[in-house]
Amino acid sequence: MLGKVLRDRLIRAITRPPFRDELGRKGRFERIARAGPHLIRRLRLVIDGWPRWSHPLRVIFLSDFHTGSHSDDVARLEGIVAEARAFTPDLVLLGGDFVNMQLFGAGRVPPKVIAAVLARLDARYGQFAVLGNHDYLYGAREIADALRAHAITVLDDESRSVKVKNHSIDLVGIPNARVVSARSKQLLAGLVPESTVGSGRPWNLYRPIAAT
């Protein structure tokens, strides 16, 4: 029993150093921990039965930031958010993995810093997020609290309906698609395909059912 306690403490010490690196600089490892370029994909989706508006609904989906994995990660996140803002989104969906472990350098990037950057994304219909597996490993409560403090809705086996003119889009957040809870099954069973965006982790198990 004592061995398990010591092992668990060691694992926590390795994977959960303090949230104290405000910039994500990685300390002495800065030069060898650069992130690769991020990927932007544009899709135009048409839904049968929906009107063809003069201003199509613009949805931005951002995911897998892993902030803290690379040097200057906060500046990298700021750049991604600036690019997303240029698309003038109507709705923002955040797919989780906001943080990652920081074995080297000054410590992990505080969730409040990440949430403050993401809050710069203005969207008339709001921002909605699910947590990823890294978020659960390295501080789900802290991350969810930080996002909510910046008016970002976190969907944890929950759904929300967004009114768009005379139509509605149902957002369903399934945080961990590997372990589908009774609540998850209930939410998925009640989906209306014409109006639902389903999102879960990992993403290859769920696809957007409808979006435009």
Describe each PLM feature range.
Residues 58, 90-91, 126, 168, ...:
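Residues at the starts of beta-strands that form the adenosine-phosphate
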Residues 62, 95, 130, 172-174:
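Short hydrophobic segments within beta-strands
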Residues 18-25, 37-41, 71-72, 108, ...:
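A short linear-motif detector with a strong N-terminal bias
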Residues 47-52, 66-69, 100, 133-212:
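Conserved catalytic scaffold of divalent metal-dependent phosphoesterases
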Residues 72-163:
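Core catalytic region of metal-dependent phosphoesterases/phosphodiesterases
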Residues 58-61, 121-124, 192:
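A short alpha-helix capping/helix-coil boundary motif
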Residues 27-45, 100-102, 106-118, 169, ...:
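Short secondary-structure boundary segments
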Residues 1-58, 62-72, 78:
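Acidic, histidine-bearing metal-coordination/catalytic regions of metal-dependent phosphoesterases
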